[in-house]
A protein has these predicted regions:
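Conserved short alpha-helical segments that host acidic/polar catalytic motifs at enzyme active sites
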Residues: 1-250, 254, 258-297, 306, ...
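Short acidic loop-to-helix transition motifs that present clustered carboxylates
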Residues: 128, 154, 196, 325-334, ...
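Glycine-rich, anion-gripping cofactor-binding loops and their flanking helix/strand elements
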Residues: 179-201, 329-363, 504-538, 568-582, ...
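Generic C-terminus detector
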Residues: 226, 252, 543, 556-558, ...
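Active-site phosphate/pyrophosphate-binding segments
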Residues: 259-263, 267-297, 387-516, 589-609
Length: 609
């Protein structure tokens, strides 16, 4: 995690660094710092908490100068304190480093450096980078960084500034993102384009193992042997307005309401329902190749994985192919049975989640074909996959993923139909029927959102509870999992999800009047079974909040609270049913006074193991 910004130019570096760090706060927000070359010395400012605290400190204690580096932290090694905040210095205090990622061999290096006389001031792994560069620095910062790179193990990106080498900053990318922005007499470095988009749209994406030197007039990228490389400059065509709140109290609420529009973007141009045709050339997989796969493995983390669980149901239903879905962090270490007859689908909003990236690489190493379902364009995973399905959900800022989830599920619907068609399991008419309904889903969700005020009353009634159980079956079991994840991550209420039929095998022991049960009980093949499960809860004095299909009056007999959703087919119901659960979590968290967009201990992009 963590966010990095670097600036070399003619404007006040502190202003640019602070503005950039605010845009990167989604990557971590437990402490932050900047270092600016002020005359011939380095002005270092570090504060615990969000960027606004650092901003106050810089206002009180200005750091004037036109060259600097900055960092927003999500703690891995060492608590979130001012002395653990970046930038970190070497012994001389003349060299500063910011870093995103983990240095796996930092203890070994720290011992070696301590023995040779270096003294450390923090509990971080980052500080070894500063001391290692110091130990190799014989007057050429670039060379010292290259030698240091050769000693570090792990996945990371870092940027270095040395007051004795006052016209440049140097960076290296080794697994975590680092991009450079080209300006006129000023140049930028950052973890993400959003940090520097107000200044430039011309971006260079670094590859792993590349070392970068940034001066006011030029950006030079080197390979690990310090041979200069020719790098392509990409022009960014989206803007930051898409990443602002547009009058909503929180990004999460805005993003929930954006779902009709994002789904329209995800689906747009990808099918013709009247002809029952899909246009998915971007998968980079011919119909013949797709038809030959014997199994599919879906790997992802968190919400992205839950979309994958829905994908498993859909792929098995429509394409009749065996599918497993697993946590990327488990998959990468469990010796999975995959080979060149396996299609591995990796799902990620950010496209840079460390476990998902590593799982994808492992799958490729074993000969599988990889397909990414990704939101962030040109992200690490997107660039390495054999084929990419971009979900086009736009920037998602709220740490709790909402619009990316429904867009990922929509991607799975299209991919499952496509596979069903090329494998001869679905006729053109069948595909056309599902697509015709899919086309209506954005307006179905709009209608659902217009009538969603009642969810605030439900939230009010349950905001003080300490535990929740979520139940669902079939394709809506993942909906229950996603609902529970949303609630726990932003409201800090303990919430767990179970397949409704599994409840009687253990969790039923938890049921009493203090633990509300949220049941997804929309019309489906297992509707009657879910009703029985709800009755089992009621028989034990449980309180039940039911997500039910509009017009289902029967449910009033069983439910304490009902949230109605429009009727849609079972296969597409996860797209609709999750929306009230997102809203329920949002309103409960808001009523509890939680930081909805930046919940404690989390970060939007998890680039560490
Ligand atoms: C979502 O609400 C979570 N914050 C988290 O589970 C997230 O979905 C997960 O970390 C995966 O992120 P990715 O989609 O960017 O790979």
């Amino acid at each position: 995690m963590c966010g990095i910004v670097g600036y070399v130019g003619h404007q006040e570096a502190a202003d640019i660094l602070l503005e950039g760090l605010k845009k990167l706060e989604y990557r971590g927000y437990d402490s932050a710092g900047i270092a600016v070359l002020q005359g011939e010395a380095i002005a270092l400012r570090r504060e615990v908490g969000k960027i606004r605290n650092l901003e106050r400190e810089v206002l009180a204690n200005p750091a004037a100068g036109t060259l600097g580096i900055g960092h927003t932290r999500w703690a891995t090694h060492g608590r979130p304190t001012a002395y653990n905040a970046h930038p970190h210095t070497d012994c001389s205090g003349k060299l500063v480093v910011v870093h995103n990622g983990i240095i796996e061999n930092y203890l070994e290096l720290k011992n070696e450096l301590t023995e040779s006389g270096h003294s450390f001031n923090s509990e971080t792994d980052t500080e070894v980078i500063a001391h290692l560069i110091e130990s190799y620095n014989e007057g050429d910062l670039l060379l010292a960084v290259q030698k240091t790179y050769g000693r570090l193990r792990g996945t990371y990106a870092c940027v270095v500034l040395d007051q004795r080498d006052p016209d440049r900053i140097v960076g290296v990318k080794a697994g975590n993102p680092l991009i450079a922005g080209l300006g006129d007499g000023e140049q930028f470095l950052a973890s993400d384009v959003a940090a520097i988009l107000s200044y430039t749209r011309d971006i260079i994406y670094l590859e792993d193992g590349e070392i970068i030197e940034v001066t006011r007039d030029a950006i030079t990228v080197y390979d690990p042997d310090l041979r200069p490389k020719n790098k392509e400059v990409s022009r960014i065509d989206w803007n930051l307005v898409a990443a602002e709140k547009a009058g909503y109290e929180h990004f999460m609420l805005k993003e929930i309401h954006e779902q009709p529009a994002t789904l329209t973007n995800t689906l747009g141009g990808r099918f013709d329902d009247r002809q029952g045709k899909l246009f998915l050339d971007e998968l980079n997989l011919s119909a013949e190749t797709l038809a030959k796969f014997e199994r599919i493995s879906i790997v992802a983390c968190g919400t992205a994985l839950y979309s994958g669980y829905v994908g498993k149901y859909l792929l098995e239903e429509f394409a009749r192919i065996p599918v497993d879905a697993d946590f990327a962090s488990e998959f990468r270490y469990r010796n999975p049975v995959i080979d060149d007859r396996t299609l591995v689908i990796v799902v990620s909003q950010s496209g840079e989640t460390a476990d998902t990236l590593a799982a994808m690489r492992e799958a490729k190493r074993r000969g599988a074909t990889t397909l990414g379902i990704i939101n962030v364009k040109d992200s690490a995973i997107a660039r390495e996959c054999d084929g990419v399905f971009y979900i086009h959900a736009g920037p998602e800022i709220g740490v709790a993923s909402t619009k990316a989830y429904t867009a990922m599920v929509a991607a799975f619907v299209l991919i499952a139909l496509h596979l069903g068609q090329v494998r001869g399991k679905l006729s053109t008419v069948q595909v056309g029927e599902v697509l015709a309904e899919l086309k209506t889903i954005p307006s179905v969700i709009s209608r659902m959102l217009e009538g969603a005020d009642h969810i605030q009353d439900v939230a009010q009634a349950f905001a003080a509870c300490r535990d929740f159980l979520f139940l669902g079956r079939g394709v809506n079991f993942p909906t229950a999992m996603e609902g529970a994840l949303k609630l726990k991550e932003i409201s800090y209420i303990h919430a767990e999800a179970y397949a409704a039929g599994e409840m009687k095998h253990g969790p039923i022991a938890l049921i009493d009047e203090h633990m509300p049960v949220v049941a997804v009980a929309t019309k489906s093949a297992t509707y009657d079974k879910v009703l029985s499960n709800i009755q089992e809860v009621k028989a034990r004095n449980g309180t039940v909040i039911v997500v039910a299909t509009e017009g289902d009056l029967n449910i009033t007999e069983y439910a304490d609270q009902i949230i109605y959703v429009p009727a849609v087919s079972e296969a597409l119901s996860p797209l609709v049913n999750v929306v009230p659960l997102q809203l329920l979590a949002y309103h409960i968290a808001r009523l509890r006074g939680c930081d909805v967009d930046q919940p404690r201990n989390l970060a939007k992009s998890v680039t560490v193991e």
